[in-house]
Amino acid sequence: MFTDFYFIYSKGKLSATGCVYAGLQEQSSPSNGVWWQANLIGRYNITDALSVTGRIEHFNDPDEVQIVPVTGVKGFQSYSSSLGLNYKVAENVLLRLEGRTFFSDKYVFVRGEEQVKNSNTITSNITIWF
């Protein structure tokens, strides 16, 4: 079973979205696998072509239905936050650069050969739509 709830807000140069996803996976073990995720995303349009985006989210999967930590730790729970810069190159092309940090109370991430409780990434992408 899967369900979600979300909202979308937009006024002028500011927009926000938020959502909560939840799932229940039948398992052969005594408990069914329940997982959920929630996030909040805000965007501010500096110009028609340039915007900045911030995001916070939480993911909880104690029964490892969606995510199994590679570190061998039982269950997965993590928070994350990010800040991104978007540049609209053309009407249907977007460039994005984003810095993101993940936090957990368990050693679910790997850095080199070490198990750690947080992870930092910088990603970029090109989105093209038709």
For the regions a protein language model found, what residue spans apply to each?
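Oxyanion-binding "anion nests"
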Residues: 1-31
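Sequence/structural signature of outer-membrane beta-barrel proteins
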Residues: 21-29, 60-68, 100-111
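Outer-membrane beta-barrel "beta-signal"
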Residues: 87-94, 99, 116-130
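Hydrophobic, lipid-facing positions within transmembrane beta-strands of outer-membrane proteins
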Residues: 1-5, 36-40, 79-83, 120-124
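Transmembrane beta-barrel strands of outer-membrane/channel proteins
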Residues: 5, 18-22, 40, 54-58, ...
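Residue-level signature of outer-membrane beta-barrel architecture
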Residues: 8-11, 44, 87, 101, ...
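Repeated loop/turn-to-beta-strand initiation elements of outer-membrane beta-barrel proteins
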Residues: 13-18, 49-53, 87-97
